[in-house]
């Protein structure tokens, strides 16, 4: 993950994925708060990357540091529910594809939003009192060393890279 001044969220994010992954890569792009201290105490692989006004460049640097078979990308202000860990592990173990799409939930009180879904009672802790969420399907897991790279200075995606793979 790439971070800058994420001390408010980083610990919660790391706690949500520690039991799910074998390696955590944190790339700091210039934090001036306690972000790096939090990362260090969590035994992550921490790297500095000078900010270049390019989110894709920072993400691609993080990919270059990963050594495991699969890469899960997540932002510091996001979490993965522990109840979903077994499902994700099974998807990875049984996948015949190099990519896995997960549902990302954007929690909101605005029930008029397009695609709004009421919070499932199994996820009330994650919803933090919000009325529900809007879902986005996004590639969040992919095999390492297959040439996938992020593209886009802002709102970076794997789309161009995935198209090249066919």
Region locations from a protein language model:
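Catalytic-site signature of metal-activated, phosphate-bearing donor transferases
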Residues: 56-63, 69, 74, 80-166
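Short, well-formed alpha-helical segments that are part of the catalytic scaffolds
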Residues: 1-23
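Alpha-helical solenoid scaffolds in eukaryotic macromolecular assemblies
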Residues: 4, 8-12, 30, 72, ...
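A conserved acidic beta->alpha catalytic loop
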Residues: 16, 20, 28-40, 51, ...
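Conserved donor nucleotide-binding strand/loop of the catalytic core
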Residues: 36-61, 65
């Amino acid at each position: 993950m790439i971070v800058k001044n994420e001390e408010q969220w980083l610990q919660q994010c790391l706690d949500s994925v520690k039991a799910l992954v074998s390696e955590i890569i944190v790339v700091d792009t210039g934090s001036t708060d306690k972000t790096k201290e939090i990362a260090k105490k969590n035994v992550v692989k921490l790297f500095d990357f000078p900010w270049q006004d390019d989110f894709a460049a920072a993400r691609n640097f993080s990919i270059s540091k990963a050594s495991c078979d699969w890469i899960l990308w997540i932002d510091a202000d996001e979490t993965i529910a522990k109840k979903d860990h077994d499902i994700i592990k099974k998807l990875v173990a049984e996948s015949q594809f190099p990519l896995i799409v997960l549902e990302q939930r954007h929690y909101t009180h605005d029930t008029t939003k397009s695609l709004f879904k009421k919070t499932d009672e199994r996820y009330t802790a994650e919803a933090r009192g919000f009325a529900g969420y809007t879902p986005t399907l996004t590639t969040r897991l992919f095999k390492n060393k297959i040439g996938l790279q992020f593209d886009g200075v802002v709102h970076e995606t794997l789309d161009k890279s995935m198209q090249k793979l066919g």
